From Swiss-Prot:
The lineage of its organism: Eukaryota, Viridiplantae, Streptophyta, Embryophyta, Tracheophyta. The active site is at D287. InterPro entries: CDK, Kinase-like_dom_sf, Prot_kinase_dom, Protein_kinase_ATP_BS, Ser/Thr_kinase_AS. A lipid is attached at G2 (N-myristoyl glycine). This is Probable serine/threonine-protein kinase At1g09600.
Length: 714
C-alpha cells in the first residue's frame, strides 16, 4: 500500500468525483486524522505498499494552521466486484462533520492508478448566462444574445466590411434583399436585411424563429442560411444566402417566355420535394408564392423567405394566426379566420402556382379579403353544410353564402392537360382534408405520365429576372403612358382654344363661359400665345391638380389656394368687357387678356362671380387697388409701352412636355422684373407707414373727442 503525504496550503477544488469514485470529506481532530505510517516531519513524503493491493494511495496535505488533508485513492478491480472507485478526502476545517460532492480533477490511467491533475476551470453561472457571455465575446450584440441565443448558438458573426453591396433585388414586408459580393470568396450572395425598431424583443424573437427554422432545414430545394452579419453596436442584421438569378414570378410574367408541360412538371416537382422536407421537419412555410420560389442559372428551384414560417405538431393542435399567406394564394379557411390548420395551407398555395404556370397569370387576384373569398367560392364552390358545422370558423356567420356556389374548376381550366387538371382539382379543394399531402401529390398521374419532368440542367437558360424587375418595368410603362396621355390632352385643348373669338369681338356670352368651365380639369387651359400681341408669357411647371378652389390671383401670374396649390392662369385673349376685373393693370385701349386670365370665376366654378363681374371687380379693388392711388397702373402702362416696341417674342416655348404658358405681368424681360419687385416692396413700406400715421391720427381724434365730451359733462 502506497501512501503519499505532503503538507502545505489546502486546495479548494482539488478533489472531484467521476462516475467511478466517491468523495467523502470528514473533519476530525489533528491527533486522530494522522495515520500511523505518516511521518511526523513536515514537507516530507514517503510511500508504502500493501501486501493485499499495491494500487491504493493516500495523500495528506496540511497548512500552517495545522490543518491536514488526507486523500485515500482506492481503485476498483472491475473483474472482482462492481463497486465504483472511492476517494476519501479528510479535511480538518472544524469539529463539525461535513459531506459534499465535488467535480474531480483526477485522471485515471490505463493501470487504474489515480494521479492528481490541475483542476479544470468550471462555469459557476447558469448555462444560459454562460452561453450569453460567450456569444457576446464572440461578437454578437447583447440584445440578440439575450433574446435569441438559441438561433446564433455555435456561430460567429460575419463583418459587414467583408461584403460589397451591389443592388437591391427584393422588397418584403419586414425586410429588404440586396445583391452583394463576398470579398473573401469573391462569390455573389443575397443579403436579407432585417432591422429592428427600438430593439423590440418580440421582433427579435420573430426574426430568431426564421433563423432557427432555416438552420433546422437542409435540402437541395430549400434555401440554405450561410451566415449572419451583425456587430455589437449594430441595430440591424443581414442573413446571408446563396444568390439566385431568378424567381418564378419574374420568369412567368416575362413576355415571350412560355413554359412547356415538362418544364412546369420540373418546377412543381422540386417545389413539392422542398415542401415535403419542410413538413417532415414540422415546419409550415405559410407564404408560398412565385416570388418566393427562387431559381439559379441551372433552373434549380429553392424555397425562400421563411419569415412567416412556423413550427407545428400534427397530433397536438396549437392556435396559429390566420393573417398569413399572400392574399392571392391564401386558402379559404384562413380567410374565414381559422387558427387550427396544418400543411394543407401550403398545398392550396401550391395549387394556385400550378394553375398560374399553365395560364400565365394569377388565377384569383383579389384586392380585399372579401373579394378574395368571393373569387374562391365562384371558382371552387362553397363548402358543404357539414363543413360549416364541424369547422366552427370564426367568420363563418359573416361570409357564409345564402346560396351555395357551384364548383367550376374543370370548366375554367379546360385547356389544361387532364393530369394537371386532376391535380389542380385536388389541391384547390375548399375543404382542407381533401387536399392530400405532398407525398400524394408527387405520386399523382401528373408526374408519372408522359411527358415526364425535365431535368433542370436541360431547361433553357434565361437572363436574370425577378418580380421586382417586372414591377419596375410596369411602373415605367405606366408613367410613359400617363405622360403621353397628358401631352395628347394638352394638344387637344390647344386645338379647341383656336375657336376663341377674335380680339375685336364685343363680348362673349355667359353661356359660352359656363361651357368652358368643364375644362378646368385639363392639364392646360391656355392657348399658344401670339408673340405679336401685347402681353408676356412665362414657362411654368404644370399643375399637379387641375382643380383650384378658393384661389385669388394677383399680378396676373398665380396665387396659392387654401390647400397650398398653385393656381395658374390662362394666356388666351378675350373681349374688352371682361377686363373690368383688371382696371388696376391696363387702360381700356390695351389689348385684352384671356377670359381665364386673372379670373378666378372660371377656375373655381363660381357662377356668382361670372354673373356679377362687378362684384369681383369691387372686391379686388377693395383689397388690392388702394395702394398709392393707382401708382401700379401708371407704372405698368409705361412698361407696357416699352414692351410693345419689341417685335420678337419673349415667349419661352421650350419643350412641350409637361409645360404650359400662362399670362404674366405686362413688363418687359430683363432687370425690369427686379425693379417691379423693388417698387412692390416700396409700396408695402409706404402702406405700413401710412397705417401707422392713420392709427396715430385716430388716437388723437379719439382723445380730442373724449376731452370734448368730458368738458360738456357727457
Amino acid at each position: 500500500m502506497g501512501c503519499n503525504c505532503t503538507k502545505g496550503t489546502r486546495p479548494d477544488n482539488d478533489n472531484v468525483d467521476n462516475s467511478n469514485s466517491i468523495v467523502s470529506n470528514v473533519n476530525v481532530k489533528e491527533r486522530r486524522s494522522k495515520p500511523k505510517k505518516t511521518p511526523k516531519k513536515k514537507k516530507k513524503s514517503k510511500s508504502a505498499s500493501s501486501s493485499k493491493d499495491n494500487n491504493v494511495g493516500f495523500e495528506e496535505r496540511s497548512n500552517d494552521n495545522k490543518e491536514a488533508s488526507l486523500t485515500l485513492l482506492i481503485p476498483i478491480d472491475a473483474k472482482k466486484d462492481d463497486e465504483s472507485e472511492k476517494k476519501v478526502n479528510l479535511e480538518r476545517k472544524s469539529s463539525r462533520l461535513v459531506f459534499q460532492r465535488r467535480p474531480t480533477g483526477i485522471e485515471v490511467g490505463a493501470n487504474n492508478i489515480g494521479t492528481l491533475q490541475q483542476p479544470k476551470m468550471t462555469r459557476i453561472c447558469s448555462v444560459s448566462n454562460g452561453e450569453r457571455g460567450a456569444q457576446v465575446m464572440a461578437g454578437w450584440p447583447s440584445w440578440l444574445a439575450s433574446v435569441a441565443g438559441e438561433a446564433i448558438n455555435g456561430w460567429i458573426p460575419r463583418k459587414a466590411d467583408s461584403f460589397e453591396k451591389l443592388e437591391k433585388i427584393g422588397q418584403g414586408t419586414y425586410s429588404s434583399v440586396y445583391k452583394a459580393r463576398d470579398l473573401e470568396t469573391n462569390q455573389l450572395v443575397a443579403l436579407k436585411k432585417v432591422r429592428f425598431a427600438n430593439m423590440d424583443p418580440d421582433s427579435v424573437r420573430f426574426m430568431a424563429r426564421e433563423i432557427i427554422i432555416l438552420r433546422r432545414l437542409d435540402h437541395p430545394n430549400v434555401m440554405k442560411l450561410e451566415g449572419l452579419i451583425t456587430s455589437r453596436v449594430s441595430g440591424s442584421m443581414y442573413l446571408i444566402f446563396e444568390y439566385m438569378e431568378h424567381d418564378l414570378a419574374g420568369l412567368a410574367s416575362t413576355p415571350g417566355i412560355n413554359f412547356s408541360e415538362a418544364q412546369i412538371k420540373c418546377y412543381m416537382k422540386q417545389l413539392l420535394h422542398g415542401l415535403e422536407h419542410c413538413h417532415s421537419r414540422g415546419v409550415l412555410h405559410r407564404d408560398i408564392k412565385g416570388s418566393n420560389l427562387l431559381l439559379d442559372h441551372n433552373n434549380n428551384l429553392k424555397i425562400g423567405d421563411f419569415g412567416l414560417a412556423n413550427f407545428y405538431q400534427g397530433h397536438q393542435k396549437q392556435p396559429l394566426t390566420s393573417r398569413v399567406v399572400t392574399l392571392w394564394y391564401r386558402p379559404p379557411e384562413l380567410l374565414l379566420g381559422s387558427t387550427d390548420y396544418g400543411v394543407t395551407v401550403d398545398l392550396w398555395s401550391t395549387g394556385c402556382i400550378l394553375a398560374e404556370l399553365f395560364t400565365g397569370k394569377p388565377i384569383m387576384p383579389g384586392r380585399t379579403e372579401v373579394e378574395q373569398l368571393h373569387k374562391i367560392f365562384k371558382l371552387c364552390g362553397s363548402p358543404s353544410e357539414e363543413y360549416w358545422k364541424i369547422s366552427k370558423l370564426p367568420h363563418a356567420t359573416i361570409f357564409k353564402p345564402q346560396q351555395p356556389y357551384k364548383r367550376c374548376v374543370a370548366e375554367t381550366f379546360k385547356s389544361l392537360p387532364s393530369s394537371a387538371l386532376a391535380l389542380v382539382e385536388v389541391l384547390l379543394a375548399v375543404e382542407p382534408d381533401a387536399r392530400g399531402t405532398t407525398a400524394s401529390a408527387l405520386e399523382s398521374e401528373f408526374f408519372t405520365t408522359s411527358p415526364l419532368a425535365s431535368d433542370p440542367s436541360s431547361l433553357p437558360k434565361y437572363q436574370p429576372r425577378k418580380e421586382i424587375d417586372v414591377k419596375a418595368q410596369e411602373e415605367e410603362a405606366k408613367r410613359k403612358k400617363d405622360t403621353s396621355s397628358k401631352q395628347n390632352d394638352s394638344k387637344q385643348v390647344s386645338r379647341e382654344s383656336k375657336a376663341v373669338p377674335a380680339p375685336d369681338s364685343n363680348a362673349e356670352s355667359l353661356t359660352s363661359i359656363q361651357k368652358r368651365q368643364g375644362q378646368h380639369n385639363q392639364v392646360s387651359n391656355s392657348d399658344k400665345f401670339n408673340p405679336g400681341e401685347d402681353a408676356a408669357s412665362f414657362r411654368i411647371e404644370p399643375l399637379k391638380s387641375g382643380t383650384a378652389k378658393d384661389g385669388h390671383t394677383r399680378y396676373g401670374v398665380s396665387s396659392v389656394n387654401r390647400n397650398g396649390e398653385n393656381v395658374m392662369m390662362g394666356s388666351s385673349r378675350s373681349p374688352r368687357k371682361e377686363l373690368r376685373t383688371q382696371r388696376s393693370f391696363v387702360q381700356r385701349g390695351t389689348a385684352q387678356l384671356s377670359r381665364f386670365s386673372n379670373s378666378v370665376a372660371a377656375r373655381d366654378g363660381s357662377h356668382f362671380a361670372i354673373a356679377n363681374p362687378r362684384w369681383f371687380e369691387d372686391s379686388y379693388n377693395n383689397n388690392n387697388g388702394r395702394q398709392n392711388g393707382g401708382a401700379w397702373s401708371q407704372r405698368l402702362v409705361v412698361k407696357h409701352k416699352e414692351f410693345t416696341k419689341h417685335k420678337e417674342s419673349i415667349t419661352v416655348n421650350g419643350e412641350k412636355k409637361e409645360r404650359m404658358h400662362c399670362s404674366g405681368p405686362l413688363v418687359s424681360a430683363g432687370g425690369n422684373l427686379d425693379e417691379m419687385l423693388k417698387e412692390h416692396e416700396r409700396q408695402i413700406q409706404l402702406a405700413v407707414r401710412k397705417a401707422r400715421v392713420d392709427k396715430k391720427t385716430n388716437r388723437g381724434d379719439n382723445r380730442q373727442t373724449q376731452a370734448f365730451l368730458a368738458a360738456n359733462g357727457r
